[in-house]
Amino acid sequence: MAKQIKTIDYDSENDIFSINNGEKVKASIDIGDFVLDVNHNNFICGLEIMSASENLGISKDVLRNIRSMKMSVNYKTNHVYVLLMILFKKEGKEVNVPIPLTLDLGHKTPRKEMLIYN
């Protein structure tokens, strides 16, 4: 079952995009311009992207106008694959943004999880 994304925030002045599902954060992991928040079960519960417009290839104006969003997370034994599916208010179109990350969160078996905001 999909988890609900509780908050989406875009700070256009600092160009920082963040989402979280409201779970308590055990640790934050910095990977370049990306910060992953991990819960006590070692699952991603939040994501922060610095220089978001550049890293996502999306204008600041568009990032201010997100209507809905899904974040698919595939946990493998030695990496995590995050896919953001963003629907924008103005254009009414959806953009898929893949974020492959090499990160071992200690998962012994592959698992997929979906977080949704609408």
Name each model feature, range by range:
Residues M1-I31, H40, S51-N118:
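Intrinsically disordered terminal and processing segments
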